[in-house]
Amino acid sequence: MEDSSLDTLSIVNETDFPLYNNYTEPTIAPALIAVAPIAQYLATAIGKWAAKAAFSKVLSLIFPGSQPATMEKVRTEVETLINQKLSQDRVNILNAEYRGIIEVSDVFDAYIKQPGFTPATAKGYFLNLSGAIIQRLPQFEVQTYEGVSIALFTQMCTLHLTLLKDGILAGSAWGFTQADVDSFIKLFNQKVLDYRTRLMRMYTEEFGRLCKVSLKDGLTFRNMCNLYVFPFAEAWSLMRYEGLKLQSSLSLWDYVGVSIPVNYNEWGGLVYKLLMGEVNQRLTTVKFNYSFTNEPADIPARENIRGVHPIYDPSSGLTGWIGNGRTNNFNFADNNGNEIMEVRTQTFYQNPNNEPIAPRDIINQILTAPAPADLFFKNADINVKFTQWFQSTLYGWNIKLGTQTVLSSRTGTIPPNYLAYDGYYIRAISACPRGVSLAYNHDLTTLTYNRIEYDSPTTENIIVGFAPDNTKDFYSKKSHYLSETNDSYVIPALQFAEVSDRSFLEDTPDQATDGSIKFARTFISNEAKYSIRLNTGFNTATRYKLIIRVRVPYRLPAGIRVQSQNSGNNRMLGSFTANANPEWVDFVTDAFTFNDLGITTSSTNALFSISSDSLNSGEEWYLSQLFLVKESAFTTQINPLLK
């Protein structure tokens, strides 16, 4: 249902940055009014930075009228979303910190706006302000209240990094020597790393705590971070450049059904991969394994959802994705416990006494919901009703996807639970097993083709994943179509055309994507390929650069190669030395035209290939995103510090 009382802010379409919705249901309401203007400005600024003016703009958005109104709104919105409230004493402390930051910010901002100001004085005010923000930041890392404080911490970091970039670009105009500028470049790079590390510490702490209570609570918190936090963490690293596009492809999640706890290792090891499904395919069909049991007269008949089997296009028959999700054509079997290629579910049934129920005692159905004509579900109505006769046992489900009624409960009316988000569509539907251990102790060396199978006695939940509309084009066309009107494109690593067998899904939300690809030990090349096509009217003589974001914890002697592949017309775009670096780094290719690559028409299908030769034991590397940008629009304004 819409809440017309919310003054939602429309996001400029060209930013492609879904950061708000106007529904009071489901969990992620109310609308993201507080952060939307900041996100919109950052998306514009990263495309074209307003030198020496960006800090002033961000300051006015975070502290409009020299008041902490935006930060207060962030706090109250987040408190509502995740049901966590700061004490009044803590709120008073934060308000005092806001006043201190506002005071020194206003002094600096007002001074540099004066005509004919003295650069040496501006330098002093700048250093005072930078030091004040650094000194006060720990107040926004509140132990046991990480859920609320992480959103406040994020905006204070954004303010500081914007200040540093303006100072770097201002240079002598603000009284800085080249040595000063060099020190600010070093500080900026250090703080991007430091702030992201501290942010992820808060996220991991709170997410792990909430998941131990309930996976639903954990997903609600993750939704908040996917909108209020992680896109800004991605913006920090993009502030090094001018001309790139800030785009979030993070999904939102809705959980319906019996609450189950999971630990953080279970999330990273299996649950996240089950939720994600086939990462580079669209959802086409959903099968719900449903049972109806007749019980003694004093216990109502029950409907149970025993399992959810999503089918993607093209179908692999998998319920989830670990590794690259393939079930055959393995190059070799791994004997080191690293290769987990497939997750399948087998189902059996139990009565309230946890005794097996024979199939003849069950009215069991597989209910299938096909995809609608437009290829994408936009909403769902999924509900469950609990019996009072037997604690925590479900006795009614109602499932409707789009306009398709999948299951109409036999237990009477169930109130609607409308699941939808402006700018999002349903890309994945799954369920998390309840009553089974997800902390596997299998000897992986004995598993045929390294396949894990498990039993799921009582699922009784449904988890719906909503992807932002900026991903629809890829999932419908299976290629990345380029238009001459856009200066920059973002290609998430998971939107691949092909990937080598030795690849794994890694949860990296601070990259503003649903995950990265991890390449692990293999005797052959590690490779991911991305399909590229040109829209009609594309100028194939325009010069572009390709930027790949990777993380290489251990040195790769063979380095990383970037190539274009087009019907045997292969061209090396770049070959990079991959020294050990635990942080994300960007490799930038030399400029090229699509004429150079032999891609001259919209009918030509080409591939960008990112690869490395065989990895030894202990070696691995990660691929997060690709950025394609016009050479004329792209500038590296702050050189990264490479280890």
Swiss-Prot record:
Determine if Membrane is one of this entry's keywords: no
Q: Pfam families, from UniProt?
A: Endotoxin_N
**Is the keyword Transmembrane in the record?**
no
Keyword annotations: Sporulation, Toxin, Virulence
Swiss-Prot/TrEMBL GO biological process terms = sporulation resulting in formation of a cellular spore; symbiont-mediated killing of host cell
For this UniProt entry, the molecular function terms from Gene Ontology, in alphabetical order, are: toxin activity
Q: InterPro entries attached here? A: Pest_crys, Pest_crys_dom_I, Pest_crys_N_sf
What is the documented function of this protein?
Promotes colloidosmotic lysis by binding to the midgut epithelial cells of mosquitos.
Family statement: Belongs to the delta endotoxin family.
The further comment given in this record reads: Toxic segment of the protein is located in the N-terminus.
What is this protein identified as?
A: Pesticidal crystal protein Cry11Aa
| UniProt source species | Bacillus thuringiensis subsp. israelensis
Please spell out the taxonomic lineage of the organism that makes this protein.
Answer: Bacteria, Bacillati, Bacillota, Bacilli, Bacillales
User: What is this protein's gene name?
Assistant: cry11Aa
